Amino acid sequence: SSSTSSFLPLAIMTSPDTHAKTLALLEENAYFGLQKQQVTLMLQERVACLADGSASLALDPTDAFQILTKPHGHGDVHALLHSTGTAKKWAEQHGTRWIAFFQDTNVQAFRALPAAIGVAELKNYAMISVAVPRRAGEAIGALARLVPKEGDGKQQKGLTINVEYNQLDP
């Protein structure tokens, strides 16, 4: 009987608020059975907060000369995989061909990821998405089809994109 082993890497995107705590949790729990070199922490940058739909900068209520910032968000993961060299390293050192993303707010989709990767491979897709139903008012992003209001009676072209929860009406 022959056995094969494979290296399954895991990248965790952290924020300045969660990075040290995430690293401590991994170390205190011996990386939950993973090898330390399997786990890559990627620290996302902070960006300016917007106060409204007109993209006004949000100012600190205690200091009008200080702009409020927040972690860049889920979309930063692609830039971080590139800028940190993580995707290139995985491809060159481990032969990684597919990267699956799941968010802490979408863990129920995790079980569907192997099937989704299989479909992407079979159909030769460059990308595939898995989504789960959302309820109005949930503080989590969603895939949404955005269609402009019909002002002139003409058929409007829509756009399917990931939308942050604070941009959706309940």
Sequence positions of predicted segments:
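Domain-scale recognition of functional cores that engage charged ligands
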Residues: 1-170
